[in-house]
């Protein structure tokens, strides 16, 4: 909602997921430690002054082709760069934004690694976005559909918590996503006679 994170000085990075449609007025204003903002492709409306007073803001990375805003002048912090996917260059040509650059947006993402573990175990999944060499291929969010079964951190580390199945999904700022099923099963008994 409006002013949702206003003056949150501990916030250094945000990733607006691909289900959010609107960023309300002054949502992040006054977040003086905010350095990077990644705005998913589903966002279609951005209200005024969302980054007003964000004096540490370095990068605003958009994942889509159209955002309903007239300008980002209230984010004109010296040295802030605004990135948009190069495949949408025509749609971005009418925006008047200082330090605007295109980037090669991920078109697909894959998850690899062990997809089964015993309760209490830690394993790491690897996320790979393509095409290779994209500036923001390493920017994604990982989610577990059932964190009571297994939780996942931003670096891909899964902690198996309880017997069951969960879906692990990786989302990129450009809207690409991939999922794998992760199973937590008890260790098999050994040395049974």
Description of each model-found segment:
Residues 14-16, 20-23, 37-39, 43-46, ...:
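Hydrophobic aliphatic residue packing
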Residues 103-193:
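Extracytoplasmic soluble-region selector
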Residues 15, 38, 55, 95, ...:
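A compositionally biased, intrinsically disordered/low-complexity signal enriched
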Residues 1-12, 86-87, 103-105, 192-193:
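Short intrinsically disordered, low-complexity coil segments enriched in acidic
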Residues 74-104:
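Extracellular/surface-exposed low-complexity segments
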Residues 1-4, 24-27, 47-50:
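Consensus positions within tandem repeat domains that build extended binding/scaffold surfaces
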Residues 7-10, 16, 30, 39, ...:
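Repetitive beta-strand solenoid architecture
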Residues 8-22, 32-45, 55-70, 78-89:
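Structural signature of tandem-repeat unit edges
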């Amino acid at each position: 909602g409006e002013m949702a994170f206003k003056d949150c000085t501990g916030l250094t990075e945000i990733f607006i997921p691909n289900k959010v449609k609107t960023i309300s007025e002054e949502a992040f204003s006054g977040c003086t430690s905010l350095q990077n903002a990644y705005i998913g492709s589903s966002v279609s409306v951005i209200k005024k002054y969302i980054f007003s007073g964000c004096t540490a803001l370095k990068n605003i990375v958009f994942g889509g082709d159209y955002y309903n805003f007239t300008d980002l002048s209230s984010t004109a912090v010296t040295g802030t760069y605004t990135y948009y996917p190069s495949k949408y260059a025509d749609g971005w040509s009418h925006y008047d934004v200082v330090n605007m650059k295109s980037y090669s947006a991920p078109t697909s993402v894959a998850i690899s690694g062990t997809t089964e573990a015993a309760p209490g175990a830690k394993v790491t999944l690897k996320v790979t976005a393509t095409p290779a060499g994209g500036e923001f291929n390493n920017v994604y969010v990982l989610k577990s559909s059932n964190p009571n079964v297994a939780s996942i951190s931003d670096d891909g580390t899964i902690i198996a918590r309880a017997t069951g199945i969960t879906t692990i999904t990786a989302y990129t700022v450009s809207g690409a996503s991939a999922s794998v099923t992760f199973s937590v099963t008890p260790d098999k008994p050994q040395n049974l006679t």
